[in-house]
């Protein structure tokens, strides 16, 4: 029977099946950070267990680490405790760790592919929603809870029920000014934040194949915002060339044998999907969110919708609450809406390719006087490369803050926060109430739109910044 990519990876990792369909699934890679691991390690300690495969586990601190003045340490006591606890646990259990002082340190979902830890055909888990990022490698990657983190540490397996298959085909060619972020925002706007519930999304089509690995990671990263369990893209020559030479990747003949296998990781002709969605990339324009859910997407040329036109009372009330929180009016144009801050970073858009796009827009220009703008590279290696290419100086000359690697303003767990009422054009993945700080207002955008908005001081169409 014809199989999907998800079916193939799943079948290759099932250790055992239970009568109700639950599978014991083998896990190839376990990524660990400071937020969801403390109780998991403590559970091992109390049960007298060891980490079953330290060689398949790697840890890094990213959520709580400051992105400036690291010599001063972490000021917030709870954040400092989480990082210190992670360091104690990895030392006690022998888990490989990339410390904050390491040149490779960064966001776990950036360094996994960057180091060649994440590879095609693998099952990859982490106690973090955006583990779906690694699906860009052609891997089955998904977030897990703290109790599951403990289970994987102890057994290298998980109890999982198989998901449904969903295909999102993105045909056509992306127009100038549009990017992978616009693709995934448009998808979420089309199917909603519950559209992928119970499914693993496979992204395919001409526009997906044309994306570089950074773009593919952006798309897979936000699969969870569509409600999906995971998102993945079949590996191809773009993937293989990206993997080649990575520190943890196979070398020489071992790599060539691996590539021969990875070439089989594609959905068979005639494979059946439970749901199929088609998007025309050529019709896209740069996207921006207006509300407090990633599905509240409109083109930058569009307007805030009017709740009065919504027939469902519950949805209408939700829209009214969003507009009140975001301080927007029905019918208001998004383009030209004044902003206070710009954040270029996060596991969605902090790779060197993202920074090149943003730097290309701000080169020779200045950040608007009332805007606080920052660029936070996804890893120390991205930071070093951006500095070597002169991108960091472009940002500094324009008036951006240039920071150390970390999750930063994506979430309010470190010093990088919005003040109440501040409006931010952000390349991150979530725009919930208070996500970037209590009372902060977040508009999800691409790196190009974030850069353009920093210069104009308002939400801007990057196509007009040539």
Curated annotation (Swiss-Prot):
GO molecular function terms noted in the UniProt entry: 3-isopropylmalate dehydratase activity; 4 iron, 4 sulfur cluster binding; metal ion binding
Lineage: Bacteria, Pseudomonadati, Pseudomonadota, Alphaproteobacteria, Acetobacterales
Cofactor(s) needed by this chain: [4Fe-4S] cluster
Recorded name of the encoding gene: leuC
Family statement: Belongs to the aconitase/IPM isomerase family. LeuC type 1 subfamily.
Details of cofactor binding: Binds 1 [4Fe-4S] cluster per subunit.
Pathway the protein contributes to: Amino-acid biosynthesis; L-leucine biosynthesis; L-leucine from 3-methyl-2-oxobutanoate: step 2/4
Function: Catalyzes the isomerization between 2-isopropylmalate and 3-isopropylmalate, via the formation of 2-isopropylmaleate.
InterPro entries, alphabetized: 3-IsopropMal_deHydase_lsu, Acnase/IPM_dHydase_lsu_aba_1/3, Acoase/IPM_deHydtase_lsu_aba, Aconitase_4Fe-4S_BS, Aconitase_4Fe-4S_dom, IPM_dehydratase_rel_enz, IPMI_cat
Name of the molecule in the record: 3-isopropylmalate dehydratase large subunit
Organism encoding this protein: Acidiphilium cryptum (strain JF-5)
UniProt keyword annotations, A-Z: 4Fe-4S, Amino-acid biosynthesis, Branched-chain amino acid biosynthesis, Iron, Iron-sulfur, Leucine biosynthesis, Lyase, Metal-binding
Binding-site residues for [4Fe-4S] cluster, renumbered to this chain: 347, 407, 410
HAMAP family tied to this protein: LeuC_type1
Quaternary data: Heterodimer of LeuC and LeuD.
Gene Ontology terms describing biological process: L-leucine biosynthetic process
